[in-house]
């Protein structure tokens, strides 16, 4: 088993769990996985997750599942990814689990291609929840009038969300609706996904973090309604962005909260380079302080360069270097906290 990428310690531990007389005993199963196209990294992941697969009867247990996966158009290229992500597909009961789960997914998604796409994103735990929770949660969404296309997109992009415990799922749905989201609108699915993927403790930590900037609950909620995905960022990322935009650039926290889309951009790759250029232009009096946060960060690179770098290159030839982070404000004799 050492040859499949496992450390000697892991190989020894798994051998002990399986009561192997020799680490070489499951070589036929390892060779089988390699023949399917799995890399050593993928095989080691499979072995760690489902070590008993190594002792499964290939002919009676594994090959029927493999035949089923191929029958639903899981290509040879897709098999390694599908199996490494979810090795349970090769050991769960075909009649009692895999086929019923497939039928549930197929009834919603209609195409095998979308079912395979969904299977790639399901963990072993999620796969176990398809029959238990999936159908009930779909009924909740359909009962709210959520469009079929939106449900399909949610399932294919984040199937684990719809596999959540039924009570947990329903509670979060009610909470999202209470925040003002309409199930018919696309933002509802994004908000539900973020809320279900964030633990109550983490959610509270993020809300408390915004409150420390002086933002009210209504302001935070408005930001979430405008751009739900910003709450999926880590608290550290959110606080770093707020610190730069408020303390370095001088924007009010409420202004940042009214434009939550700015959290979609990288601090190092977009926000700091662009804001550095803007700060130089402001300090030199070449642009007005009324310039909006959105116009700075959401415009394309080409437009930004034309409006703020090329336009002023004769008066400030160093702007290109500032934009490319080859030169900082200090090199020009400025600081972010200047006004």
Give the location of each predicted region.
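Long amphipathic alpha-helical repeat/alpha-solenoid cores
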Residues: 1-339
